[in-house]
Amino acid sequence: MTSGPNQPVSYPIFTVRWLAVHTLAVPSVFFLGAIAAMQFIQR
């Protein structure tokens, strides 16, 4: 992860990226778990 000292913390792209990734990943994992549970219950 070599971003370079030319970009200070005034541009928090890592925070936005972290928020977006978690906002998309957490519900995805929850949905996958719910679907898997439903499939196992139906079977």
Curated annotation (Swiss-Prot):
At which positions is heme bound? H22
Q: Does the keyword Cell cycle apply?
A: no
> Which keywords annotate this record?
Electron transport, Heme, Iron, Membrane, Metal-binding, Photosynthesis, Photosystem II, Thylakoid, Transmembrane, Transmembrane helix, Transport
Q: Where in the cell is it found?
A: Cellular thylakoid membrane
Self-association and partners = Heterodimer of an alpha subunit and a beta subunit. PSII is composed of 1 copy each of membrane proteins PsbA, PsbB, PsbC, PsbD, PsbE, PsbF, PsbH, PsbI, PsbJ, PsbK, PsbL, PsbM, PsbT, PsbX, PsbY, PsbZ, Psb30/Ycf12, peripheral proteins PsbO, CyanoQ (PsbQ), PsbU, PsbV and a large number of cofactors. It forms dimeric complexes.
A cellular component annotation (GO) from this entry = photosystem II reaction center
Q: Which cofactor does it need?
A: heme b
Q: Which family does it belong to?
A: Belongs to the PsbE/PsbF family.
According to the record, cofactor stoichiometry and binding are noted as: With its partner (PsbE) binds heme. PSII binds additional chlorophylls, carotenoids and specific lipids.
Instruction: Spell out where the chain crosses the membrane.
Output: 18-34
- Organism lineage string: Bacteria, Bacillati, Cyanobacteriota, Cyanophyceae, Oscillatoriophycideae
Alphabetical GO biological process terms: photosynthetic electron transport chain
Q: Name one GO molecular function term.
A: electron transfer activity
The membrane topology noted for this protein in its Swiss-Prot or TrEMBL record is:
Single-pass membrane protein
| Chain's role | This b-type cytochrome is tightly associated with the reaction center of photosystem II (PSII). PSII is a light-driven water:plastoquinone oxidoreductase that uses light energy to abstract electrons from H(2)O, generating O(2) and a proton gradient subsequently used for ATP formation. It consists of a core antenna complex that captures photons, and an electron transfer chain that converts photonic excitation into a charge separation.
Q: What is this protein called?
A: Cytochrome b559 subunit beta
